[in-house]
């Protein structure tokens, strides 16, 4: 489904606004910008506050791509004992862990097949309201 909304080509500065930028340059399709691999992409809503230190709030929408290979410190959706969670991936000494994204790394979940923990996708965008 194509959904276009007005897009201003002028960048939003942090200073004083220019009165010459009060017009729309073109329309933009958010799907084209947020979704790179349609068959492998899904959106999921966040429930909980464990990721607020990395800018992910309760109720946010996450755009997730299952085709991407996660990197160290990627934000991921993981399956932990048949429950989907959003966590930060940390790789150390040939081991991979999931953390809450806070500065406290003491609460780690080891990723391995015996524990029934695996990464389901990489978070590519976080959508949240600022109002």
Where in this protein do the model-derived segments appear?
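Short, positionally conserved secondary-structure boundary motifs
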Residues: 1-52, 83-84, 91, 95-96, ...
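Short, hydrophobic/aromatic-rich segments at coil-to-beta transitions
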Residues: 41, 71-76
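PDZ-domain C-terminal substructure recognizer with occasional recognition of PDZ-binding tails
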Residues: 80, 85-105, 109
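C-terminal structural segments of small proteins and small subunits
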Residues: 105-112, 118-126
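Structural motif
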Residues: 59-60, 74
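Short coil-to-beta-strand transition motifs
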Residues: 58, 79-85, 117-118
